[in-house]
Amino acid sequence: MIARVWRGWTNAENADAYEKLLREVVYPGLQKINGYHGGYIFRRSQDGQDETEFVAVNLFESLDAVKAFAGPDYDVPVFEPEARRLLSRVEPIVRHYDVKIAL
């Protein structure tokens, strides 16, 4: 199992819209991908900051399944056009980890 981990940030006023887009568009689309095994979205806002951080952890059966989703440059984030509009900044690289323990 491969965990695909990525971070992005929205301005505070776009955070709810971005979360809604993930819930209603992005994740339903991911669930249709062969080899996709679910994921998590973590959201964090810190006092005094105008940005909200989102961390996406998506699980794939194999690196081949990741490549089928993301293409040959699988270390580059994949965005819906609307998601990119809502994000104020993004990590340019996605990290991939072998899942060794899942309880």
Predicted feature residues:
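Non-catalytic surface loops within mature trypsin-like serine protease
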Residues: 12, 61-62, 98-103
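Short amphipathic alpha-helical segments
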Residues: 12-38, 74-82
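Short hydrophobic/aromatic beta-strand micro-patches
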Residues: 9, 42, 57-59
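Short, glycine- and small/hydrophobic-rich beta-strand elements in well-ordered beta-sheets
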Residues: 27-55
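Glycine-rich beta-strand-turn "strand-cap" elements at beta-sheet edges
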Residues: 40-51, 78-103
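Short amphipathic alpha-helices within nucleic acid-binding modules
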Residues: 16-20, 51, 62-74
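Active-site-flanking beta-strand signature of metal-NTP-handling nucleotidyl enzymes
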Residues: 2-8, 55
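Mobile, glycine- and charge-enriched loop segments
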Residues: 9, 61, 72, 79-80, ...
